């Protein structure tokens, strides 16, 4: 892959730690050296990203299924932000700032003239263990009101909250109240561990860095990391928090990539530009934050602002998604890569295509050759 033109590798630290990746990093460095390449090693921090929990095996979700949402215990003390951010985030997370999304009147039969709601309401509240369970961070629970949408795995799976129930159980003479949340599957699919989760419209403020992020940053330099990618950047204080952690680790020379994945990042892009070494247009979660038909326009707006400021930017997500299972890309995919380069992208990156795909070498071949074709067109 290096011999074909690959310039580096990205590790997603939502699934593995740097300390666990020593063998893989060593193989990458040896392969690059054989090809005369000085490789980039980018690491994607966990940051404020929301993800589902770890499960022993994938869960098949079918349209119309009812699933139960349960919690991943949130260890608030294991998360870290800079002092000013910590106070601000705590204030924003209070219930008074929760943006409620009204339930749609005809969703699951709520309202007159629809009997489905009353039947579902009786059927939802069964004994624990009778539903497929999806784990979400508990900080999402105040937002799980009927009508709230939940998008999983970059929007491939679409749920809608239909019921919130409370069980009262007696334990040692004391009553314990347990809240349970139920959702209807609108678009099904195969859900695996640690997939992205989004609640469109909900204002959720997880901490900028987790304890795991800080541990990874501490050893980033000795592991040969050249760039840190901060997900879901909301404002420049997120980037300053990461910079502070890099300084404390003696790793100020590691480049900082700001991932634009929500509308906060889009709106505040001008303020983010001076604080980041490179902007990442991360179209997976960004495509959950806007209508998909608006995503190309948002991508172009970000590209224009980066060009005007002289700031390099990267385009990622589904560049060659069909090649996870096909040895040949679609015409639309090569067109996408071509126009990303023509719009001024300094770099492009594939993810699942090489991480879990069947044709990683062919992915790099098509990507590199398409980039070279675009560069040739630019210079014509």
Set out the residue ranges of the language-model regions:
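Non-catalytic helical/linker scaffolds that mediate oligomerization, partner binding
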Residues: 1-110, 117-380
């Amino acid at each position: 892959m290096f011999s074909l033109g690959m310039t580096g590798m990205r590790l997603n630290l939502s699934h593995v730690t740097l300390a666990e990746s020593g063998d893989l990093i060593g193989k990458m460095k040896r392969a690059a050296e054989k090809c005369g390449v000085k490789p980039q090693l980018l690491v994607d921090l966990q940051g404020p990203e929301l993800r589902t929990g770890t499960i022993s095996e994938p869960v098949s979700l079918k349209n119309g299924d009812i699933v139960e949402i349960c919690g991943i215990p949130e260890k608030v003390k294991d998360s870290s932000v800079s002092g000013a951010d910590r106070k601000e985030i705590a204030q924003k997370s209070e219930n008074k700032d929760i943006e409620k999304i009204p339930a749609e009147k005809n969703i699951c039969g709520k309202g007159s003239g629809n009997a489905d709601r009353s039947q579902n309401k009786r059927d939802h509240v069964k004994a624990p263990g009778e539903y497929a369970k999806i784990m979400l961070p508990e900080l999402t629970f105040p937002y799980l009101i009927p009508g709230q949408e939940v998008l999983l795995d970059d929007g491939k799976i679409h749920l809608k909250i239909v019921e919130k129930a409370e069980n009262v159980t007696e334990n040692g003479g004391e009553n314990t109240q347990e809240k349970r949340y139920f959702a209807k599957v609108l678009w099904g699919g195969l859900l695996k561990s640690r997939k992205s989760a989004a609640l469109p419209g909900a204002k959720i403020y997880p901490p900028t860095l987790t304890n795991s992020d800080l541990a990874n940053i501490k050893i980033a330099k000795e592991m040969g990391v050249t760039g840190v990618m901060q997900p879901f950047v909301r404002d420049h204080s997120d980037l300053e928090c990461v910079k502070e952690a890099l300084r404390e680790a003696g790793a100020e020379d590691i480049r900082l990539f700001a991932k634009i994945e929500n509308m906060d990042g889009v709106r505040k892009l001008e303020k983010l530009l001076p604080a980041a070494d490179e902007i990442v247009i991360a179209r997976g979660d960004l495509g959950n934050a806007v209508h998909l038909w608006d995503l190309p326009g948002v991508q172009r707006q970000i590209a224009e602002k980066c060009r005007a400021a002289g700031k390099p930017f990267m385009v990622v997500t589904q560049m060659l998604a069909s090649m996870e299972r096909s040895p040949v890309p679609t015409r639309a995919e090569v067109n996408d890569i071509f126009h990303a380069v023509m719009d001024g992208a300094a770099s492009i990156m594939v993810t699942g295509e090489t991480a879990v795909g069947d044709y990683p070498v062919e992915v790099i071949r098509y990507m590199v050759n398409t980039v070279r074709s675009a560069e040739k067109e630019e210079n014509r």
